[in-house]
């Protein structure tokens, strides 16, 4: 009789350590209040040069074990999965977890689609790095085209100059997806806190159902505060360091991606800075 062989534990033909091995896109539902989010997880470990492969089932078990607990804190989900995996993979020195997903938040216009992000790394040295964030689509209006059309209108209608200085004028607008991710090593910053930071700059997510007055208000408000993607990134970063309980070494990562309505390309801006560096630039 041939015994079962632990192939993964055998010595590889080529003895080189592997930095990252694991599973990708393991999907699972998780309840957030009265709604359910569908998340997708990647889990990676490193393996030494003396080991042929990783026990992939342990990656699945690590995720399932945490999800089976009676209460789950979404903000520290990545931390708990990392710790669980580090205990199961006794030959790994570090674990990395990436979680993405879509959460549909009930609103007056149906459901707001919000993308969630969790990025966690932990090691046998006890170090933990946990980043959490979200993004959603909102509307922006271009300030450059607005000032150009303001000048053009004043040439066509000279008597309008006095009024034109005080009202938003014609410009193009676009769907804009802005993402905010921050350090959250203690899991104390809620996704709702991050949402409120984005909302303070971008307003609420775009909705499928808009009645006439709501549509008018949405467009009017966007044109009252026209923004480049650069403006969006700066305003979100400023709101993050003033509204969130971030320590000096915590990271603030912001990106803004606009689907330009008058161009066949997108406009994009991003920044990645420590909270301390942002505060220094802002003289806070």
Swiss-Prot record:
Site annotated as May be catalytically important: where?
Answer: 142
| Pathway given in the UniProt record | Cofactor biosynthesis; 5,6,7,8-tetrahydromethanopterin biosynthesis
Give the Enzyme Commission number.
3.5.4.39
Q: How is the cofactor bound?
A: Binds 1 Fe(2+) ion per subunit.
Instruction: Identify a single GO molecular function assigned to this protein.
Output: iron ion binding
* Catalytic activity, reaction form: GTP + H2O = 7,8-dihydroneopterin 2',3'-cyclic phosphate + formate + diphosphate + H(+)
Q: Using the record for this protein, list the coiled-coil segments as residue ranges, or answer none.
A: none
Q: Does the keyword Nucleotidyltransferase apply?
A: no
Q: Which key words are in the record?
A: Hydrolase, Iron, Metal-binding
Cofactor(s) required for function per UniProt: Fe(2+)
Pfam assignment, any one: GCHY-1
The biological processes this protein is annotated with in GO are:
tetrahydromethanopterin biosynthetic process
Q: How does it assemble?
A: Homodimer.
Family, as annotated: Belongs to the GTP cyclohydrolase IV family.
What job does the chain carry out?
A: Converts GTP to 7,8-dihydro-D-neopterin 2',3'-cyclic phosphate, the first intermediate in the biosynthesis of coenzyme methanopterin.
The record's listing under HAMAP family reads: GTP_cyclohydrol_A
Which protein, by its recorded name, is this?
Answer: GTP cyclohydrolase MptA
Which organism does this record belong to? Answer: Thermoplasma volcanium (strain ATCC 51530 / DSM 4299 / JCM 9571 / NBRC 15438 / GSS1)
State which gene encodes it.
Answer: mptA
